[in-house]
Design a protein with these regions (language model features):
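PLP-dependent enzyme catalytic core of the Aspartate aminotransferase-like
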Residues: 77, 147-148, 318, 327-336, ...
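Conserved PLP-anchoring active-site segment centered on the Schiff-base-forming lysine
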Residues: 81, 99-121
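Active-site phosphate-binding strand-loop segment of PLP-dependent enzymes
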Residues: 135-200
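Active-site PLP attachment segment
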Residues: 211-244
Length: 375
């Protein structure tokens, strides 16, 4: 099977270790187990005693019930039988395509987005059609263009909400209109929702699974809950044919997700409100820092993110984004992601949810590099 190189991951793998100012990171500032117990008030001794007494078997093959129950609390209409645990959201996306998409199937995906959403189905021989998101439309899908791309042969529409890399957020009304387009073709909607709940304004972030019977939500413990080291995600859907197919295909390459990961994730999700409060505080304070910097730096511009942890920032230098980001890294230690990883030239993705001082110092380093190039 041929597949395009995963541009973002190859870039991160090559440069992340050793970065002086890591503002390419997309998870909310990660926490330790000690931090988790302190934040949640969970009894560490009691938890560790239960964990140490647990036999290290495969565990619950279809997922620890307490973990799946915790995941259900992130939605309005799901029960534990609607949840399929996976190794991260990347594993969840892969399992959805592996389970549902065949050669010749028509798949419509937005761009820019996480590359999995178009490169994996393309590698399986799907007819992948791209719906380009524009800066002029605040990176929201143009519904007329989507209608033209969706045909009776369309098997799946792939979206990402909130969007990576732009931070755009689709409203419930917009999602409902996309649902009607999908329903006209009896197509699934796969929505990568790893940044859901991280909006800049208070209120419930709608999920595709609460709006559409053929909606498939993918998420994880990594971005919002700062627990990427657990490598634990999930597929959520009301469509039990999808659940059945994903579990069947999962038997071939995953079996189960691991006793330790699911126990710790279940403990975290019992106290999700406390973790979400921490994460929202970080992204809201840090976005203000980023917004102030964009306003003061004459050579950059962006559409201010509505949610998530990332922003797509344009620069006005006549230099490719790979060259810009690599040279800047070597000269200043500032680590960002080239926009060309998302097929958006003359831009960079900045992750603003990591350490506040890293963000401040990293943005200063970007300004120093730009000043160096524009003298």
């Amino acid at each position: 099977m041929k597949i395009k190189p995963f541009a973002v991951e190859e870039w991160m793998n090559a440069w992340e270790v050793g970065a002086k100012y890591n503002i390419a990171e997309t998870c909310v500032d990660s926490i330790s187990m000690n931090d988790l117990f302190e934040l949640t008030g969970e009894d560490k001794t009691e938890f560790l005693n239960r964990l140490c007494a647990r036999r290290l078997s495969y565990g619950d093959i279809e997922g620890l019930p307490e973990f799946r129950k915790g995941v259900c609390g992130l939605y309005k209409t799901l029960n534990i039988e609607n949840i399929v645990p996976t190794h991260g959201a990347s594993g969840a996306n892969h399992h959805v395509f592996y389970s549902l998409i065949s050669p010749g199937d028509r798949v419509v995906s937005i761009m820019p987005t996480y590359q999995q959403l178009y490169s994996i189905p393309e590698s399986y021989g799907a007819d992948v059609q791209i719906l380009h998101l524009s800066k002029e439309n605040n990176y929201l899908p143009d519904l007329e263009k989507l209608r033209r791309l969706v045909t009776p042969k369309t098997k799946m529409i792939c979206i990402n909400n909130p969007n990576n890399p732009t931070g755009a957020l689709m409203s419930e009304q917009l999602l409902r209109e996309i649902v009607e387009i999908a329903r006209s073709a009896d197509a699934w909607i796969l929505c990568d929702e790893v940044y859901r709940h991280l909006s800049q304004e208070d209120g419930w972030c709608p999920s595709i699974v609460d709006l559409y019977e053929k909606g498939i939500s993918v998420s994880s413990m990594s971005k919002v809950f700062s627990l990427a080291g657990l490598r634990l995600g999930w597929i959520a859907t009301h469509d039990m044919s999808v659940v059945k197919s994903c579990l069947s295909h999962r038997d071939y390459n995953l079996v189960s997700c691991g006793v330790f990961d699911e126990m710790l994730a279940a403990a975290a999700l019992k106290h999700r409100d406390k973790l979400l409060e921490r994460s929202r505080k970080i992204v809201r304070e840090n976005l203000q820092i980023l917004d102030d910097w964009v306003g003061s730096e004459p050579h950059v511009s962006y559409v201010k993110p509505k949610a998530g942890t990332t922003a797509l920032v344009y620069y006005d230098l006549d230099i490719s984004s790979y060259e810009f980001c690599e040279e800047m890294y070597k000269k200043t230690g500032a680590f960002v992601t080239p926009g060309d990883c998302f097929e958006v030239p003359h831009s960079m993705r900045i992750g603003y949810a990591y350490g506040k001082q890293d963000l401040i110092d990293g943005l200063k380093a970007i300004s120093e590099y730009i000043a160096m190039k524009t003298r």
